[in-house]
Amino acid sequence: MGIKSLFGFGQARDKPVDKAADAGYSFLFGRTTSGKPVNERTAMQTTAVYACVRILAEAVASLPLHVYEYQDDGGKKLVHDHPLYYLLHDEPNPEMTSFVFRETLMSHLLIWGNAYAQIIRDGAGRVLGLYPLLPDKMDVQRDDRGNIYYVYSRNSDENPMFKEYGDIRMKAEDVLHIPGLGFDGLIGYSPIAMAKNAVGMTLACEEYGASFFANGANPGGVLEHPGVLKDPSKVRESWNSVYRGVNNAHKIAVLEEGMKYQQIGIPPEEAQFLETRKFQINEIARLYRIPPHMVGDLDKSSFSNIEQQSLEFVKYTLDPWVIRWEQSLQRSLLLPGEKGKYFIKLNVDGLLRGDYQSRMNGYAVGRQNGWFSANDIREMENMNPIPDEQGGNLYLINGAMTKLEDAGAFAKTDTGQQNTPAQENSGKRGKR
C-alpha cells in the first residue's frame, strides 16, 4: 500500500469518505511504537486526555448561546421568540439540556475530530429537535450528482429496545456536522489518531508505574543458590507468591539451603519516571492547546502570568472552536430566508472579564467618554436596566472637552477679547 492510498490522495474529491470509518484510516489507530493499542476509548483512560477534553467540552457548553437579529442601524437584537432560541439555549431535545448536548458534541469533536447530530424538522423545514450521533458510526459520501449524504450504522448497542438495525441514509440538510481540522474541508481528523504515539507512551508510562507499585515499588532481584536447582521456576513462583505485591511488601524473608538474595537497583534513567510522566502530560496539553496550569502543572505559573495564560486560552484555543460551532449552526439550522436576517452567537465575553477593580476602571473610562451608557454597563454586570426617564440609556461625555480647532475660540469676541467665565465671576464679585 502506497502513501497516497493511505492518505486517500489518489481518490476523487467527489467521493469523500469518513476516514474514521474507512479501513484505510486504521493505520492511524491500533498499535503504537510503545506497544500500547490506542483508540478513542483507551485514550480517555489517561488523566491528561480526559482533563483536556473535559476542559474544552465544559467551556463550550457553559457559554451563553443566543439567536440575534440584524438591525438596520448596524446593531443586533436578541430574539427570544425565534424557534431556534429555546432549542439551542435550553433544550435541544426532550432527553437532554443544552449544556449536555453541547458538551457531548464537543467531546466527540475532540476525540473523533467530527461531531454529528440528527436534525428533526417539520413540514416547513423548521427545526424541532437535535439528537447527537456517534461519529464512529457515521460515514460521509457523495452521490453521482455530487450531493453529500450521510450513512449512519445503527446497532443494538445504541438502543437495545429498537428492533430495526442497519444503515440509515440521511440527507445533508438533516444532519448537523461540525468538522475539526481536516485535509478536504469536509471530514475532520481525530486528534487522538494523529497523536497516537504520544498517547500510547502516556498509557505505557501509567501501566509501568502501576506495575512498579503493584510489586511493592521493588525493582526485583536475584536469588543465588550455591548448588544446582532442579526446578528454578518453582522456586521463583514460591518466592513471588509470598513476597511479591503491595500487600506483601516489607515482609521478612527466610532463605534456605544457603540461598542469598541480591536486590537490583533502579537505573538512573528509570528514576526519571516522574519527569517522563510530566513531559507526557504537557505533550497531551500541547495537542489540545491547553495551558499547563489548567491540567495541574503549576511549575512555571505565577499569580501574574496565570491570568494572561487564561486570556490566551480564550483567544487562541477556545475562539477557533467557537467559530466552528457558530458557522456550522448557522449553516445547518437557519432557513435559507433567515441567513441574512439572523445569526447565532456563543458569547465569550464573560471569560475575558478581568478582576472587579479593572472592570470598574474600564467602565468609568467608557462612561466618561461616551461609548457606554449606564444600562450598557449594568447589562455587562448582569444587572437590571435603569428606566429611560432616569437616564439609563444616556451617553455622556466630559463637557470640558472641545475640538482642537476650537481650542482658543472662547477667548475671541467681535471687538477683540472675551472674558472667561472665571473673569466674569470675578468682575461680578467686585461690583458688589
What do these predicted ranges mean?
Residues 272-276, 280, 310, 355, ...:
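Secondary-structure capping and boundary motifs in well-ordered enzyme cores
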